[in-house]
Amino acid sequence: MLSPRKTKFRKHHRGRMKGISTRGNSIVFGKFALQALEPSWITSRQIEAGRRSMTRYARRGGKIWIRIFPDKPVTMRPAETRMGSGKGSPEYWVAVVKPGRILYEMDGVPENIARAAMKIAAYKMPNKTQFLIRDNKDLIDSKI
């Protein structure tokens, strides 16, 4: 699973997910993409589950790019612990995803295989997504 090697601070504030994604919202590497339509935190386990399902469906053909990285630690306190005595320890990592962000890209496979593989990966995501196709300079989209 994905996680940073080294961070400046061990614990982060939770923060708010306001607005839409201004970066990482266009297809750069592949021909097909999965785009987020809602804001959410996507865990490293969910990212890995989506990647595995896509690679298994596409078999040997094609290349997959993961366009998000979990760089925010989420802390949890132990069960049945009294209030106070500081913040909990980091348990897992999440990627903060805003609407419009490209999650995965794919190339080297036919459209029907890419669409089916992305649909399987979309089931593993906590937010609504849509399938995008890069057609020269035009983008053709369809909601999954």
Swiss-Prot record:
GO CC annotation terms, alphabetical: chloroplast; mitochondrial large ribosomal subunit
GO annotation terms (biological process): mitochondrial translation
PROSITE patterns according to UniProt: RIBOSOMAL_L16_1, RIBOSOMAL_L16_2
Lineage: superkingdom: Eukaryota
Compartments, record wording: Plastid, Chloroplast
Keyword Ribonucleoprotein in annotation: yes
Name recorded for this polypeptide: Large ribosomal subunit protein uL16c
